[in-house]
Amino acid sequence: MNLVVIEGIDASGKTTLAKRLAESLSPRFKVLLTQEPFTDDIKQLLEKYQWKDQVLLALLFSADRRIHVKWMESQNVDLIISDRYFFSTLAYQGVGVDRTWLESLSSIFPLPNLTILLDVPVNVALERLRNKRDSLDFEEKRKSLHQVRENYLSLARRYNFKILDGTLPLEKLTSISLELVQGLLSSSTSRGSQGT
């Protein structure tokens, strides 16, 4: 399973880039686009109760992710592109939960072949969010996004993410990302042909 993950803070452009990558690669490869949270039940629970307990959220996201990973492993495709993965739990719940516990919880999940971090300044993300939603507490969101962004940058160093400037035009981000993904697919194809 070739797994590419797109990560970043809220409003960094993850979903848009993931869709564009899938569209660009689909003519030549069997591509599956997915996202987390994965199951509708978890999404509905999160929307209904709006929980703030970060331990509870980490457990819910991990249960959802376990279902997601099992489903991904059952797919017969060349590439899976996921909008978020366990790094989101480490970045977001890592603001208020013991990092060692979170990493232990996430250790059962396979590492992606490639993780792209769309890095945007918090003020850019907040402006994008302001254009989407009316009722955000921007001061609270600003404080938490600063820490989440720092967590992502720390994870990027540790897990060797490819960091892209999320303020670049979509065409440029797509071009850079396609190059990275095609490099991954070429190397996995050549490894597969060497084994035959």
Swiss-Prot record:
Record keywords, A-Z: ATP-binding, Kinase, Nucleotide biosynthesis, Nucleotide-binding, Transferase
Residue positions binding ATP: G8, I9, D10, A11, S12, G13, K14, T15
UniProt-listed InterPro entries: P-loop_NTPase, Thymidylate_kin-like_dom, Thymidylate_kin_CS, Thymidylate_kinase
SUPFAM superfamilies, per database record: P-loop containing nucleoside triphosphate hydrolases
Top-level EC class: transferase
Entry's Gene Ontology cellular component terms: cytoplasm
Gene expressing this chain: tmk
GO molecular function: ATP binding; dTMP kinase activity
Protein name (database record): Probable thymidylate kinase
Enzyme Commission no: 2.7.4.9
A Pfam family hit: Thymidylate_kin
GO biological processes: dTDP biosynthetic process; dTTP biosynthetic process; dUDP biosynthetic process
Similarity comment: Belongs to the thymidylate kinase family.
Catalytic activity: dTMP + ATP = dTDP + ADP
